[in-house]
């Protein structure tokens, strides 16, 4: 896994080159989520990165979960996890997550829906799971309204210094 933001972006071609020589390696490029941690200026145009991958990959597949593209490079998989303002990701998400502190989380894009599980018995855990499912909100809700909307139709391939254009 590699979080994609301005400081890690230049290392992506080398990471892809590295995994393309391994057997069964997979690189998940995870979109930086400033709405959760701040630092919006670190954000990268993830759609431009996806265009770059699409132009260079040997083959592109589509995963059912989140309807994510899988870019194949010499058999190695590169997958972009891009949930920020991505309705397609949300529409195809059926996951409940568990945080490092054991809290249940119904949406990757939110931290205001956490349900504590510490100390719960079996019945309490069942109730917690039911509650997290009942509290799910499609497409993030309004709590991220201060961040720009995405339009992947206008994306152009990102350029990496020293690498030829596709």
What are these regions (language model features)?
Residues 1-79, 83:
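Radical SAM enzyme [4Fe-4S]-AdoMet core and its adjacent flexible, acidic
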Residues 86-166:
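Flexible mid-to-C-terminal extensions adjoining Fe-S/redox cofactors in radical SAM and related proteins
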């Amino acid at each position: 896994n590699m979080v994609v933001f301005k400081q890690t972006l230049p290392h992506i071609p080398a990471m892809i080159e590295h995994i393309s020589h391994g057997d069964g390696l997979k690189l998940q490029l995870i979109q930086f989520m400033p709405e959760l941690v701040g630092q919006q200026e670190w954000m990268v145009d993830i759609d431009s990165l996806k265009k770059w991958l699409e132009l260079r990959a040997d083959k592109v597949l589509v995963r059912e979960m989140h309807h994510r593209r899988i870019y194949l490079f010499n058999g190695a998989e590169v997958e972009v996890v891009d949930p920020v303002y991505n309705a397609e990701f949300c529409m195809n998400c059926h996951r409940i997550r568990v945080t490092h502190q054991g809290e249940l989380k119904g949406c990757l894009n939110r931290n205001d829906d956490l349900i504590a599980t510490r100390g719960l018995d079996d019945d309490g855990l069942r109730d917690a799971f039911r509650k997290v499912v009942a509290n799910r909100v499609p497409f993030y809700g309004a709590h991220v309204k201060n961040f720009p909307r995405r339009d992947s139709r206008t994306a152009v391939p990102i350029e990496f210094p020293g690498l030829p254009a596709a």
